[in-house]
């Protein structure tokens, strides 16, 4: 019974500890990755709320074109900065203007 050697409490042999130490040293030498911290952006102010516009007119094509992207798709609220109420008015006005042939359905 004197041949039995005591294992460490965490059951990791000294050889395994050396391998783990080598691997951790290798990863730190290869290059430590930096954490990227993103600056939170302030919320955009709704264009229509700022001007005090309650309803969006479908005949005002210049204003509606600002809410379309290059493929003539309606821009989302995040990109345009519109509030929920005005985004719904804008999307309905764009749809009416498309039916009246004031705005294109697809890219030219």
UniProtKB/Swiss-Prot annotation:
Residues 1-12 have a biased composition (Polar residues). It holds the Pfam family Ribosomal_S18. The keyword RNA-binding applies. GO terms for biological process: translation. InterPro entries: Ribosomal_bS18 (IPR001648), Ribosomal_bS18_sf (IPR036870). Coiled coil: none annotated. Keywords: Ribonucleoprotein, Ribosomal protein, RNA-binding, rRNA-binding. The keyword RNA-binding applies. Residues 1-33 are annotated as: Disordered. One of its GO terms (cellular component) is cytosolic small ribosomal subunit. GO terms for molecular function: small ribosomal subunit rRNA binding; structural constituent of ribosome. Belongs to the bacterial ribosomal protein bS18 family. Binds as a heterodimer with protein bS6 to the central domain of the 16S rRNA, where it helps stabilize the platform of the 30S subunit. Part of the 30S ribosomal subunit. Forms a tight heterodimer with protein bS6. PANTHER family: 30S RIBOSOMAL PROTEIN S18, SMALL RIBOSOMAL SUBUNIT PROTEIN BS18M. This is Small ribosomal subunit protein bS18. The gene is rpsR.
